[in-house]
């Protein structure tokens, strides 16, 4: 059976970027259709990414906090985990949110077509679904087809004990020994979950630090904590993976490589993601896709074909949901005739580990590469009353300032709920605030977020909660 639809806008993909674009189009009065290959809206982020991982990380945090309270006189019994119930709760979280999206799509009169969509021309798209083909004739298209985990040719990915992030989030079992390939955000978050549930975690990372994009001083604080839980093998890489009946045997080389192949019950491959640009027949619409699968766009998110836009992971790094959402808004507004551009000063990044590692704006490495003369100011949480009282005094807040203008150009936080504290720094950079603006803003006490104001005071030389190196000498 084949049906045909005519619409002003078709959005290919219903992740955060896609559904945000579609809903914004509808709000601006445009007739809109979403094409989504899966049965629910929300994409990777909501179904097999950001949201389920946070649900499981919440479970992990509660388990770890319960253990830590023994040092303060509150002793719980050894936690008993029911994997089936944890999985059910995770699915409940997902279903609540996907159900909400379905309701909003219906309320906005956005039509959803389920199936795999591919271009057949500059203004046509064909969707292959369970109930047959749907041909969509469109005036404008927004490509939001996302990305998928990288696979390596020497790894037997067909073996069910070789996981990607989606497999890890299914929580089918808790392996006794789990190897995480890749010391990035996804791998470390999943390692955090499975360690709390009882797995022995090894992490192999080819660079000299985990979370390579973040500054070394911030990562150092994080590494000190997780080294007590994980076996970190830095400056090391996997060279061979062999699936045997009794386990997955992994050979490594490098600074921390074991001399012999190691046996694991499961291996999580978390070495990055690749865009889905080559899976759409975009060339039939005249859209240029590069060798890696990315689609190049201008600041209005237009591709080389003016009425076809692209947003989210498929247009390049950083592959983050919040970036895609803003791109979706801009694309929708441009289609509606507004002269809008996607030109953010900053895009925040967060590893939702324990402790969390969060940064926004320029890192020190990036400032050096750009030739910017800068100065940093750091406030250690060991001097924070709230951090000490909350047993998280190993955290740190760092601000990076332009040396001449004193404007904040970057910042990072490592510590409990660091990601929740990052917003002020992002807003300060976006609004062009200098150190004095932040230092003179009265922050509530005792809080963790006052560490941002105190770091600015360190730079200004007005700090009284620490020894002041800028104080006048007597």
What is each residue range found by the language model?
Residues 10-12, 117, 136-146, 180-181, ...:
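Short hydrophobic core segments
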Residues 50, 145-200, 204, 232, ...:
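Glycine-rich dinucleotide-binding loop and its adjacent helix/turn
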Residues 158-175, 261-335:
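FAD-site-proximal beta/loop scaffold in flavoenzymes
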Residues 10-21, 26-38, 44, 51, ...:
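Flexible, glycine-rich terminal cap/loop adjacent to redox cofactors
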Residues 2-7, 17, 23-31, 36-174, ...:
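Glycine-rich flavin
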Residues 13-18, 146, 182-187, 272, ...:
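Conserved phosphate-binding and hydrolysis motifs of nucleotide-dependent enzymes
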